[in-house]
Each structure stands twice: as structure tokens, then as C-alpha cells.
């Protein structure tokens, strides 16, 4: 729909393929510049397919954050490999376009994988019950108070106890095919999702 009545007729689009995007509030997507070579993006970069070949491969979001409180979701649509969700520092994100660069075992990160393991600055420990095929993983990151909570289908992991992580600088959201020879598929929701959900939120301008 055009403000100047120069409307276009949609073809081969579902209802979830049509959303409102405005100059006052652009939504993040997967970043074609911060991805491994075997990451394939589609649906306006809201979907990522990562072919593992037994190695760790990653892709980040387009918009970085350095303060504030943020929430986003990812639908994980493959349960044949190990996957990781979290945040990595900008310095690490710029290296993700390498052929094989992990985001889970690095020095400035925080994340959660399908086995219920949390990662903080490269160190891992048990956290939550993990996730599987078609689960929706939510990430609530509070960079002001240095806390992160991960959700699986709306349920906070580790009884809602936040992961403590000191944030210093700028961070990107990241998903990673952590191990296995299959393909991991991710669908992102930064407010403009490629998948339908039963509930939703909007910003102060009514978008989202």
C-alpha cells in the first residue's frame, strides 16, 4: 500500500508475509554481512538455514544494542542438530563471516543451547530444559542491569532466574548451528516475524 495510491497487488504471499515497516521503526533482520558462507537467508532475511557439515556456523542480527531492555524470539524448526541462541560482542560479530567461526565458546558472549546449557564468556553450565523442533525461544536481555533470561514457548528457564553477564560495549543477537552435519533452520521475530503467533506486541506507534 502506497501513501500516494501507487498500490501493488500481492502475488504468492501469505498474510504473515505482509507487515508494516516505517522509517520511524525499522525492525532488525538476519545480517547478510555477519554470516558464515553456508548460511542461506530468505523471507526478507527473517529466515536462516545453516548447513553445518559438522562445524559451528553463525549469523547475527542487523541491529546492535549497547544499553536498554530488549526482547526477541526465534522459532527453531529443525531438531537434528545442536543450536545456540544469544548475544556476542561486536568484535566477535565482525568475524562471523569466516568459514567456521563459533559464537558459543568465545570470550564475550551469553547464550543458551538446545541441550539446556548456558554460556557466559565461553564458560558453560546447566540451565533450563533445552528445546527442540518447532519450539520458540525467547530472549529477554537487560543490558542496563547485566541480566538475561531465556524462554522456551513462553516459559522462563531456570525458574526465571536471570543469567548474570557484564555487558561492556556493543552486542549483536546471534544464532548458531553448534554441531552436527544436518541443517538448522531459524525464523526470527524482532517485531516483524515470518511466522504467525497467537499473541503479539506493538510499539507506541502501533507497529509490530
Region locations from a protein language model:
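PRY/SPRY (B30.2) beta-sandwich protein-interaction domains
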Residues: 1-208
Amino acid at each position: 500500500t502506497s501513501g500516494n495510491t501507487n498500490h501493488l497487488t500481492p502475488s504468492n504471499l501469505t498474510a504473515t508475509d505482509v507487515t508494516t515497516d516505517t522509517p520511524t521503526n525499522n525492525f532488525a533482520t538476519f545480517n547478510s554481512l555477519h554470516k558464515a558462507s553456508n548460511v542461506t537467508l530468505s523471507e526478507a532475511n527473517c529466515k536462516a538455514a545453516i548447513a553445518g557439515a559438522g562445524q559451528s556456523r553463525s549469523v547475527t542480527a542487523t541491529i546492535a544494542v549497547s544499553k536498554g531492555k530488549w526482547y526477541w524470539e526465534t522459532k527453531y524448526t529443525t531438531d537434528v542438530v545442536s543450536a545456540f541462541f544469544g548475544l556476542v560482542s561486536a568484535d566477535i560479530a565482525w568475524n562471523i563471516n569466516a568459514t567456521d567461526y563459533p559464537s558459543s565458546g568465545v570470550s564475550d558472549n551469553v547464550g543458551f543451547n538446545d541441550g539446556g546449557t548456558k554460556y557466559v564468556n565461553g564458560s558453560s553450565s546447566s540451565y533450563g530444559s533445552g528445546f527442540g523442533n518447532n519450539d520458540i525461544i525467547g530472549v529477554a536481555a537487560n543490558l542496563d542491569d547485566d541480566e538475561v533470561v531465556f524462554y522456551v514457548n513462553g516459559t522462563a528457564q531456570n525458574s526465571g532466574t536471570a543469567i548474570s553477564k557484564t555487558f561492556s560495549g556493543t552486542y549483536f543477537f546471534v544464532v548458531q548451528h553448534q554441531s552436527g552435519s544436518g541443517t538448522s533452520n531459524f525464523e526470527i521475530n524482532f517485531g516483524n516475524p515470518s511466522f504467525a503467533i497467537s499473541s503479539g506486541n506493538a510499539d507506541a506507534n502501533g507497529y509490530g
